[in-house]
Regions:
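Bacterial N-terminal signal peptides
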Residues: 11-22
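Residue-level micro-sites within transmembrane alpha helices that shape
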Residues: 7, 21, 165, 169-171
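Catalytic Zn2+-binding segment of zinc metalloproteases
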Residues: 168-183
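Bacterial N-terminal signal peptides that target proteins for export
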Residues: 2-12
Length: 345
């Protein structure tokens, strides 16, 4: 199966999940799929938003990094969604995308340690996985990217940079910071995909993504936690404004139909989406901008911490056909596991 066919299948698979699967929390810590006809859930930030965030982050980088990142901009854009592809096939991937801050009675640094080792000493790895790992995953992936820069490993730089952009973007989504991640606890099922997929697709073309130049991050762990707490601070507005607008408009005017990939699908109506987006007063734009800036900052920081290798020189290196084959085989293995994975309750 070539890469184009693979990507088409993954797209159809994910939309199948959206239309026919409700994502619920299995007993040992991941949000996994359980078939439940007629209930929908979108992938994180949506493919569109994740890809745009990685692409736009490139333009925050300094001139020294630009030859390499501009050359590989298509790779970084296309592969921004790899973690979402893996989350259905790779054990342990799903918790890396979120953290349920409301699962902890106290989120102070003393009670909820900011470093993973300290947190596992306090709660154990299973509890942490149950409630999500995204701030710790950002820290880990940051160190991995720094090492890839240090080794001047082109393939690893690209793969890890794309993944890091994904996790950072997820950390900036309010609904990735709560157990009520899809409104399922408040009768607002579907709000996850509405906020992070439908709204960006409809309105992000008008957003201002001039976020300034990438800056060095002195404390990656502190920055990761600032992101999730900042996103969580917006959660009340996300839920309350949707609930209030639904009460005013009514369920019958809340939804409409749209054509996607030749299928007629139920979506949030354009008028409802516009009014909700207006009430949020730029919230989605702010979170996307924060994601773009943070991704650029972390890429830049990894490069600096690795000793600022010559990226113009690395840009001249061609990726070998063997490396392409290995990557293609890896993605095919994700596909095989999609069919062999059992359902988990």
């Amino acid at each position: 199966m070539n890469r184009q066919m693979y990507n088409r299948f993954i797209w159809l698979f994910v939309w199948g999940v959206i239309f026919f699967v409700e994502t619920v929390r299995p007993s040992y810590g991941t949000r996994g799929p359980v078939c439940r006809p007629g209930v929908a859930r979108q992938p994180q930030w949506g493919f569109y938003a994740h890809q745009q965030i990685n692409r736009l982050a490139i333009f925050t980088l300094p001139a020294e990094m630009m030859p390499f990142f501009k050359k590989h901009s298509q790779y970084l854009t296309d592969n921004a969604v790899n973690p979402d592809k893996r989350r259905y096939a790779v054990v342990g991937e799903a918790p890396r995308h979120f953290i349920d801050l409301d699962a902890y009675p106290d989120t102070s640094a003393v009670t909820l340690p900011r470093f993973y080792k300290d947190a596992t000493d306090r709660y154990g790895p299973d509890t942490l996985a149950l409630h999500g790992l995204v701030p710790w995953q950002i820290q880990l992936t940051k160190y991995q990217l720094t090492e890839a820069f240090r080794q001047q490993n082109v393939r690893q730089i690209l793969r890890i940079a794309a993944d890091l952009g994904h996790y950072i973007a997820d950390a900036n989504v309010p609904l990735h910071t709560t157990r009520n991640y899809n409104g399922q606890l408040t009768g607002q099922q579907g709000i996850h995909g509405f906020w992070e997929s439908r709204l960006p697709e409809l309105f992000s073309k008008d957003y201002d993504f001039l976020v300034g130049s990438a800056e060095y991050v002195p404390s990656p762990q502190r920055r990761a936690w600032q992101a999730v707490f900042g996103a969580n601070a917006a959660l009340d507005s996300v839920l309350r404004m949707e609930r209030d607008l639904t009460g005013e408009i009514g369920e019958t005017r809340k939804f409409g139909f749209d054509e996607r990939n030749g299928l007629t699908t139920k979506v949030y109506a354009s008028d409802f989406s516009q009014r909700y987006h207006d009430r949020l007063s730029g919230q989605v734009e702010r979170q996307m901008r924060a994601s773009v800036k943070m991704v650029g900052d972390f890429w830049f920081t990894c490069w600096v911490d690795a000793g600022q290798p010559d990226m113009a020189k690395l840009a001249k290196r061609a990726l070998s056909s063997d490396e392409d084959l290995v990557e293609a085989e890896e993605q095919k293995s994700w596909l095989k596991r999609l069919f062999s994975a059992r359902e988990e309750n």
